[in-house]
Amino acid sequence: MDLANIDLQAAADEGVEVKLQHPATGEYLLDEEGEHLAITVLGKDSTTWQNAAKRVNTRNANRYKDRKIPPAAIEAALYEILAESTVKWSKNIEFDGAALKCTKENAAMLYEKRNWIAEQLMEAAADRASYFLK
């Protein structure tokens, strides 16, 4: 078997579309027209994810040299990596009654305020089968 054919980075760089599910019921979230609310995120093996992770890990290591990194800083770093790895989302994504444009800043805000979304995206980004076997 030629291991060169198993290129997780290339697959992760394409990303995976995650159809959002209600955090309590597991039902898919749909808009008024029956369309899924979906976010496309790069996999954790992607170049973007890896570069963002290195950057925030280095920053935290420098900031908290001989101290334990606080959980809030770890969580913020995760949201930053995830926001940077968010490629697009469906046009039916809204927050506080207004359409939300897919930007790094909006993604970070959304993931911080609704961490259940971040959890679903993290799960998909970490599941190599979700982007390699699609």
Regions inferred by a protein language model and the residue ranges of each:
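Short, intrinsically disordered N-terminal pre-domain segments
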Residues: M1-E14
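Residues that cap or initiate secondary-structure elements
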Residues: D7, A24-G26, D45-T47
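Short acidic, Pro/Gly- and aromatic-enriched capping/linker segments at domain boundaries
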Residues: A12-E27
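Short, surface-exposed, charged amphipathic helix/loop patches that serve as local interaction elements
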Residues: D31-K134
